[in-house]
Amino acid sequence: MPITPTKYAITTRQSANWSDAKRRVFALYRRWLRSTPEMQSMYSLPLPISVIRTRIRQEFERNRFVNKLPVVDVLLTKGHADYQETMNFWRQTTHMMSYFNEESFRGAKRLPSSFIDGFLQGRN
């Protein structure tokens, strides 16, 4: 299946009011959630779909209390850009796994916290 770069592109625009911004945020959120199974198979993520959806929700909840309309518009533009990059397979699996620190396949502690810990582990 060939990838069309403009398939997921959306024209940047400003929200007219808060109800318009809310509608656009919910539409973007639904797009992310609906594409979760496809993301899991494209990137061969070793995580269940429920964990991926929970992480998407956490990203949206992080910006829940933004109270300036221009800031919401910028966040929407960034969200659409991230969605396009993700669905066009312009990221690597490591980029996707960086969103899941606790489930990361690299491990939580890549480097020892002190010299003696590294020495005892045989890393130095």
UniProtKB/Swiss-Prot annotation:
Pfam families: Complex1_LYR_2. The keyword Mitochondrion applies. Accessory subunit of the mitochondrial membrane respiratory chain NADH dehydrogenase (Complex I), that is believed to be not involved in catalysis. Complex I functions in the transfer of electrons from NADH to the respiratory chain. The immediate electron acceptor for the enzyme is believed to be ubiquinone. The precise function of this subunit is unknown but believed to be important. GO terms for cellular component: mitochondrial inner membrane; respiratory chain complex I. Complex I is composed of about 40 different subunits. Belongs to the peripheral arm of the complex, most likely the globular part. The keyword Lipid biosynthesis does not apply. This is NADH-ubiquinone oxidoreductase 14.8 kDa subunit. It is a peripheral membrane protein. It is found in: Mitochondrion inner membrane. Belongs to the complex I LYR family. Keywords: Electron transport, Membrane, Mitochondrion, Mitochondrion inner membrane, Respiratory chain, Transport.
